[in-house]
C-alpha cells in the first residue's frame, strides 16, 4: 500500500514539474503555426529535427520545391537554412509571466535583410512592439557637437 502511494506521489511530482518545464527552441520550431513558418509543415519540421539529431545532413523539401535543413540546435536556439538564400533563427527567452519566442528571418540579398518578430509561447500574440523598439537614425548618428575638431 505504502509503495503504491509513494509511486503515485512521485508520478504526480513528475507530472507537476513537467507542466512547468521550460519551452525549448526545438519544441517552439515544431509547434509554430504555418503563419510563422509557411515553407514547412509540422511533419517536415519533425523530420528535419530527427535528421539533425541523428547526425544526418539530409535536407527536407519545402513548399517552394527547394530544400531546408536544421543547421544548429541548443535548448535556447535553433537555426534553419530555409532556402539557398534565406535562414530562420528561433530563440526562446524566459520572461516574467511567459516564455517569449523570437523569430529572425534573413534573406541573403547583396546586403542581408532581417526581420524579427517576438511571440508569446503559444504564438497567439505578436509582442514585438512591446518588447523591442526599432532603432532610429538618431541612434546610429552621433551628435557632431560632441566630436573634437581635427
Annotate the PLM regions:
Residues 24, 34-37, 124-128, 135:
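Localized chelating/binding microdomains
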Residues 90-96, 149-150:
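Structural signature of eukaryotic scaffold interfaces centered on beta-propeller domains
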Residues 22-93:
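Terminal domain-start segments
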